Amino acid sequence: MIRSVVALAALATAQPAAASPQSEKAAILDTVRTMEAAWNRGDFRGYMAGFKNPDVVFVSGGKFQAGWQGTLDHYIRDYGGLPERSGQLHFYNMKVDLLAPDAAMLIGQYRLTRGPRVTEGVNTRLFKKVRGHWLITMNHVSAYDVEPPPTAPAKP
């Protein structure tokens, strides 16, 4: 009887097994892929669901942006409406480093194609595991417009 009580007490206080580093990295990459899909269907709220609300820090163009809501408002204002305004977003070359059981850093590249305009850049993102979900707490972007290839002169 005492052994049964001790066994039940041990089960009741047992911590869930820690996820493997590979599964944590996969969960982070899944968060980014979910965000990418949301952007590509024009769902900016869905895109922003990957960021910690309200205290995420955004850095872009050498400036701090106005938090979660300010960034959502910016995306809706500058990229909302017609699909050609939001374009197609693709994240690639992503590398995840686990810093602690609840913290990770991702560095990767992205490409945003909006009609003839193509913007590429690098993202550095700090993730924190909050209530079992990986969320971005700091996002730094450096971007540049890709120059279109020169057109060949017409032959006389």
Language-model-detected regions and their locations in the chain:
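Sec-dependent signal peptide recognition
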Residues: 1-7
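A solvent-exposed, acidic/Ser-Thr-rich amphipathic alpha-helical stretch
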Residues: 26-31, 44-102, 111, 117-118, ...
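Short hydrophobic/aromatic-rich beta-strand segments that constitute the beta-sheet cores
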Residues: 57-58, 105-106, 136
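Beta-strand secondary-structure signal
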Residues: 105-109, 124
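Short, low-complexity N-terminal intrinsically disordered segments enriched in polar/charged residues
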Residues: 14-53, 147-156
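A short, structured loop/turn motif at beta-sheet edges
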Residues: 96-103, 127-133
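Short S/T/G/P-rich N-terminal loop/turn motif that feeds into the first structured element of a domain
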Residues: 10, 18-19, 129-130
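Short beta-strand edge/turn micro-motifs at domain boundaries
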Residues: 120-147
